[in-house]
C-alpha cells in the first residue's frame, strides 16, 4: 500500500476514449491504494508496461489477467472479457507526423505517454519533466543474435507545478 496522494488515477475525461478495462483496473487500483510499481513487482513486468495495460495500450497475457485478478480482487472472468482482446492503441492522439522515424517516436508517446505520466506522477508528484533542463542520448546495442537495437535515454529535470 502507498500514500493515496501518490496513486495515479484515471482522468475522467479520457474514459470515453479508453476501453472499459481501464475504468475497472483504475477503480480497483485506487481502492487498494496500489502503485504501478507494486503491481509490476507482482506481475514481473515493468511499471510502464503495467500502466500501459491499464490504459489499454498493451496486451495482457493470460498470466497477467490471472495475477491482476488476484492483486486487485476483480473477478478473473470480468478481466478476461475486458482484457482478452488486442489493444486498440493510440486512439486519443491527434493526427501523427508523416516522417517515418518521427512517427515512431510519436507512436511511443501515444502508446506509453499516459503510462509514463502516471508513473512519473507517482514518483515525483504533480509536475512535468523539463525539455529545457534536459539531456538525451542514443546508443546502439547489438544482441547475441546480431540484431541492432536503438536505446534512447531521456533525462529531464523534474519541475513541480506551483500552487498559486
UniProtKB/Swiss-Prot annotation:
It is an enzyme of class 4 (lyase). It comes from the Eukaryota. SMART domains: Cyanate_lyase. One of its GO terms (biological process) is cyanate metabolic process. The keyword Nucleus does not apply. Gene3D superfamilies: Cyanate lyase, C-terminal domain, lambda repressor-like DNA-binding domains. Coiled coil: none annotated. It holds the Pfam family Cyanate_lyase. It catalyses: cyanate + hydrogencarbonate + 3 H(+) = NH4(+) + 2 CO2. Its EC number is 4.2.1.104. Belongs to the cyanase family. Catalyzes the reaction of cyanate with bicarbonate to produce ammonia and carbon dioxide. HAMAP family: Cyanate_hydrat. This is Cyanate hydratase. It comes from Sclerotinia sclerotiorum (strain ATCC 18683 / 1980 / Ss-1). The lineage of its organism: Eukaryota, Fungi, Dikarya, Ascomycota, Pezizomycotina. The gene is cyn1.
